[in-house]
Curated annotation (Swiss-Prot):
Signal peptide: none annotated. The keyword Lyase does not apply. Pfam families: K_trans (PF02705), K_trans_C (PF22776). It is found in: Cell inner membrane. It is a multi-pass membrane protein. Belongs to the HAK/KUP transporter (TC 2.A.72) family. It catalyses: K(+)(in) + H(+)(in) = K(+)(out) + H(+)(out). This is Probable potassium transport system protein Kup 1. The chain crosses the membrane at residues 25-45, 65-85, 115-135, 153-173, 181-201, 227-247, 263-283, 305-325, 353-373, 381-401, 410-430, 438-458. Transport of potassium into the cell. Likely operates as a K(+):H(+) symporter. InterPro entries: K+_transporter, K_trans_C, K_trans_N, Kup. Keywords: Cell inner membrane, Cell membrane, Ion transport, Membrane, Potassium, Potassium transport, Symport, Transmembrane, Transmembrane helix, Transport. One of its GO terms (cellular component) is plasma membrane. It comes from Chromobacterium violaceum (strain ATCC 12472 / DSM 30191 / JCM 1249 / CCUG 213 / NBRC 12614 / NCIMB 9131 / NCTC 9757 / MK).
Length: 640
């Protein structure tokens, strides 16, 4: 075979492999990302016509509500998330913290107070996603299992126990990773989308009058007709958007293109047909508004559809679990959350992670919610407030990013972000009226997480400020060692430092107590960047004199620091022989934190919470991959 033909064959083979890889990513993204959005037809539309705030299912109201559902999907998912926000990625990573990292990482001249304000706003939005991550698995699986009551009322007593068992099994398979889970769940959700599209299309064929809902004027007329009651029903409309924030947060797991292809190719058309089909059914049979989804299913297919919907809602839960894992990992790397154990579950896609402690915490909280509420209708009223809060904060942060980093003109920011925020605000106000109906639950969960993140962020700021005040200039230390030499012991001592300037406090304590220093002393700083993965030089090293060297290792917030690997690179850069494990010691500071005398009650509480979190976070030895038998921890008492 000639070189030209061989090159063409290799190129065609590469293209085929690339297409197969993309198809697998699209299928995995379909299974993990779109489960929550995809199963909303189970309960979303019926909430608009039932409960304390439901409207009568008259033909005009049915057309108006369905129009609101369709245009909410188009404006808030297709436009806001898929077209706009997915372009606001941070080197491939999405989510509210990716927005926050871009805003705070590029600030210049805004002042510390403004930066802290954006951080707290971003943390509040991120915290709401935890409440959503607890409630979504509960309401999704519970709503599917309640379909058993439609098929066989005698099974009603088994709905809650079966839901608990299914949720427990879902969390138990998380260690296998989102990629493997997505590969298994993708075909299930593909079948689900095809099924709901077929059911909707059958009803649409019988009653095409519902196609009027495609005209957005019917949604506007719905508000004019129903007034305040119509506005309140937006609390039900927002249920069709649950999972949109996870779509953005999961960008790092699968990439933007597979997520877009899955949305436009299957998810969006199927959702539109499903809501149109339910609307067509209600035009002919308004008395079925209590359960329009299952009413579309012929009697012979009811049990198979209940089984498929149960599988699909298991998939739906995965979207939020994956997003919460990603969010927690980003938070810890950016300094907004204590260190936790992170396991990477894929060698080819580094964004696929598993957090054991968080997984079991979510499982217990989700099961507790199921046992407490016991009905999906009660839970459906609960989590719209968390969803709309996160969506609104995301829009605000996007506006700041567009203005400060992308340098959009004010009129463009007002046109794009202002229009989206107006819709977000309407959803939020409508859901705020459901606070006493269960909306308090996600807010309570979000507030608990926000307290942890806020206290950690505030405590770290106090600690860094105190450390700067106690730090000795490095030049002074080098001068002191030159005039007053200390005993030198064989080997290498590595002293970890949070700052790349000054002298690490752990080194000062070592000199104070031991009156000796290793022949080679390395001051190591692990620098966490505000991008997902570090580009360019990973490790920089330079000699300082007196047998001391400064080493800085740079990592993105989606990477795991590996100190031994960084030190191997540093030794090569410094011209040192490979470091011998038995002659290298790592020195870490272990600080006891207390509030300074005279501190107010709020500061004492903040320092107390921060000290508790610091005491119980994952140890630096395990987190940085240090050999446990070569680590020395030196304690100190610090008043903040």
């Amino acid at each position: 075979m000639s070189a030209g033909y061989r090159s063409m064959a290799i190129s065609a083979s590469d293209r085929e492999r690339g297409q197969q890889s993309m198809a697998m990513l699209v299928l995995a993204a379909l299974g993990v990302v779109y489960g929550d959005l995809g199963t909303s037809p189970l309960y979303a539309l019926q909430e608009a016509f039932n409960g304390d705030h439901g409207v009568r299912p008259t033909p005009d109201n049915v057309v108006g509500v369905v129009s609101l559902f369709l245009w909410s999907l188009i404006l808030m998912v297709s436009v806001k998330y898929v077209m706009v926000l997915m372009r606001a990625d941070n080197k491939g990573e999405g989510g509210i913290l990716a927005l926050l990292a871009q805003i705070t990482g590029g600030r210049s001249g805004d002042g510390r107070r403004v930066a802290v304000g954006w951080v707290l706003l971003g943390l509040a939005g991120a915290a709401m996603l935890y409440g959503d991550g607890v409630i979504t698995p509960a309401v999704s699986v519970l709503s599917a299992m309640e379909g058993l009551q439609v098929a066989t009322p005698a099974l009603a007593a088994y709905v809650v126990p079966a839901t608990v068992v299914i949720l427990a099994m879902l969390f138990m398979i998380q260690p296998f990773g989102s990629g493997r889970v997505g590969a298994a769940f993708g075909p299930i959700l593909a079948a689900w989308f095809v099924a709901i599209a077929a059911l909707g299309l059958a009803q649409l064929w019988r009653n095409p009058a519902i196609l009027q809902a495609v005209n957005p004027w019917h949604g506007i007329a719905y508000f004019q007709r129903n007034g305040f009651a119509g506005f309140v029903s937006l609390g039900a409309v927002v249920l069709c958007l649950t999972g949109a924030e996870a779509l953005y947060a999961d960008m790092g797991h699968f990439g933007a293109r597979p997520i877009r292809l899955a949305w436009y190719g299957l998810a969006l058309p199927a959702l539109i047909l499903s809501y149109l089909g339910q609307g067509a059914l209600l035009l002919a049979h308004p008395q079925l508004s209590g359960r329009p989804f299952y009413s579309m299913v012929p009697e012979w297919g009811l049990l198979p559809m209940v089984a498929l919907s149960t599988l699909a809602t298991i998939v739906a839960s995965q979207a939020l679990i994956t997003a919460v894992f990603s969010l927690t990992h980003q938070s810890a790397q950016l300094g907004f959350f204590p260190r936790v154990k992170v396991l990477h579950t894929s060698g080819s896609h580094k964004g696929q992670i598993y957090l054991p402690l968080l997984n079991w915490t979510l499982m217990l909280a989700t099961i507790a919610v199921v046992l407490g509420f016991r009905e999906s209708g009660k839970l459906a009223a609960a989590f719209g407030l968390a969803v709309s809060t996160t969506m609104a904060i995301t829009t605000v942060l996007f506006a700041v990013l567009a203005r400060r980093r992308w340098h959009w003109p004010w009129w463009a920011v007002a046109l794009v972000a202002g229009s989206l925020f107006a819709i977000d605000l309407a959803f939020w106000l409508a859901n705020a009226l459901k606070f006493l109906d269960g909306g308090w639950l996600p807010l309570l969960l979000g507030l608990a997480v926000f307290c942890v993140m806020g206290c950690w962020f505030g405590g770290r700021r106090l600690q860094m400020r105190e450390s700067r005040g106690r730090q000795l200039p490095l030049e002074a230390l080098l001068s002191s060692l030159g005039m007053n030499p200390v005993a030198r012991i064989p080997g290498v001592g590595v002293f970890l430092s949070e700052r790349a300037d000054g002298t690490p406090l752990v080194l000062l304590h070592h000199l104070k107590h031991n009156q000796a220093l290793h022949e080679t002393a390395i001051l190591l700083t692990l620098q966490m960047l505000d991008v997902p993965r570090a580009a360019g030089e990973r490790v920089s090293a330079q000699w300082l004199g007196q047998g001391m060297a400064r080493v800085t290792a740079r990592y993105g917030y989606m990477e795991e620091p590996d100190v031994p690997e960084a030190m191997a690179r540093a030794a090569e850069a410094l011209g040192l022989p490979p470091l011998e494990p038995l002659s290298t010691s790592y020195y870490l500071g272990r600080q006891t934190l207390v509030a300074a005398p005279g501190s107010g009650g709020l500061k004492r509480w903040l320092v107390g919470v921060f000290a508790f979190l610091r005491q119980n976070e994952r140890s630096a030895t395990l987190y940085f991959g240090l050999p446990p038998n070569r680590v020395v921890e030196l304690g100190a008492r610090i008043e903040l």
